């Protein structure tokens, strides 16, 4: 079975068990208040409608009469609704605020009386309104503004439905943020969406662009026939008290309304006629994870393209959680990808597909006891063809926020060893160390014990491997239950039930592969250099860098950040990764997340671009191979939030406009992780010396999507054919409203002509 076939099957399997109630109590107005949008027109329409609620007695009497008549008409029609397609319409252009009536279409009376069914439509929006109704059915008379059904989109990529018969009767909502696209390759594009209202299963499901997005289960199932006084079917808006609310502008390519509930497989196929980007890692793949974050993408000197990402099992939460590192590769320039593997993983908690709740309480729940890996970095030594995979290693129940101060190592006779605590020892004494050949020593006696660890830090007593019970995790309401199973797994020093326990701080983990990821070395903990005053020292996710020219040619570098005597730092190796040296790049102690990426200038000097807590990206320069760094210089023309976002920057191998070039990817907004841009910077030799020898002219910028669309962590790579590969999070990963979204890690390709063709100078 091909990769696409396996993905479709995986989606179908995950769909079969997906039960995710979302925002059941929230009206569209509530959702609008949660968004930062440009929808002032929408709000004005809603306010006008609410003011009209205070209608006089005559208007109320008239509305009541129409309501009774509408109910009788609906009851008569519902008894005779035919099977199959009730309505079909194609190529409808809609001016914003005008709407388009379908009341005269054949089948409209049946649509008004639907007790269940399926609605499939394609659209292209040219509007920036915050909320835009694509299709609606409702009661448009005075005093009945809360009696309607509609399918809507938001200008931040969300899709949803609202089914209301005034809040006192019923109000059902279902939505999924970051689900649809507005702009692709510089053009406004069509999306295909679908709603299935399934009375037999008491369930509504939303689909878009080949993916099942969200499910709402309601024992008291309702649909259009349950709305009192339905009098209109409308495209491009919702008629509320005689006015068009939630106006859409653009084109409805086609709409089909069915009286029956089509299958999930049919709707995945029907909506899959429009897709943008590819999921290298996706819910239901062999990793058994539903959620992926933190992209890494690298083209090797052989032309193979490799990728890595966090496979997050406990929703999209950071550590502490259960997180493994997924890896995949492409041997045809990113056209197809291998099945993922998990070169960095722990087994203390089961790996399984579980839908994490997104309600206001459940979305905050985290797995408490698992060990985890987080934030991959890929790097190739082009001289040896060896690839390295780095990540932060977090022992059981540890994340950056609760990591203990210290390195986790102890110096014995001038050498540093990983220190351990015997689980029965009183207090917090770490009186044991892992010495040569993995043997555990009692430091008080300086004698070996009968215990040792293997290359994965699994424990042995004499020659018998020790085991512990694996944990499972399941929800009971909004409570997460973590419980032991009957499954035995190898006992590991990073697990909570180990007899020897590692110090509860973060570590830097490394593996290498000499066969492009087919097999991997033993696990190496390389962070013995972590300062003892440091709470955490972690990688800047993305890729590392090898210097290609100058006196430091061949040196390997990986960006790091910390919260002790420096925010930004680096580790480097001059012996092909056998040994690593840590250097601090500043003396800042504010604790800003200084995630950084490195590029090389023509003479072998380095520039690093980093996330800051100052609404900007900063640049620092090194002329000694990364051992010392200049002060930070804010990058002009790119704005970020106060908390910042990881960025990606790479060298491009060919001149652009006759000059060396670098390419950078980042959000460009101060009010959220959104408005993703790709910039091309031309490198100029200033004629100066030292750190001022080169300047970068950010000549071109390219919009990945429209300004309100989410865009978070990203990684760029120059592909073998010269195109630029982009692996990125197509959502706002900081927003609490966008937690725990599936299949938001997208891979796309862009040519240099595309990136320069529409761009404007900064």
From Swiss-Prot:
Gene3D superfamilies assigned to the protein according to its UniProt record, in alphabetical order: 2.120.10.10, 2.60.120.200, Intramolecular Trans-sialidase, Domain 3
UniProt GO MF annotations: anhydrosialidase activity; exo-alpha-sialidase activity
The EC number(s) this enzyme carries: 4.2.2.15
SUPFAM superfamilies reported for this sequence: Concanavalin A-like lectins/glucanases (SSF49899), Sialidases (SSF50939)
Reactions accelerated catalytically: Elimination of alpha-sialyl groups in N-acetylneuraminic acid glycosides, releasing 2,7-anhydro-alpha-N-acetylneuraminate
Signal peptide (residue range): 1-27
Main localization (coarse): secreted
Key words of the record: Glycosidase, Hydrolase, Lyase, Repeat, Secreted, Signal
UniProt GO BP: ganglioside catabolic process; oligosaccharide catabolic process
Entry superkingdom: Eukaryota
Family recorded in the similarity comment: Belongs to the glycosyl hydrolase 33 family.
Protein's UniProt name: Anhydrosialidase
Native source species: Macrobdella decora (North American leech)
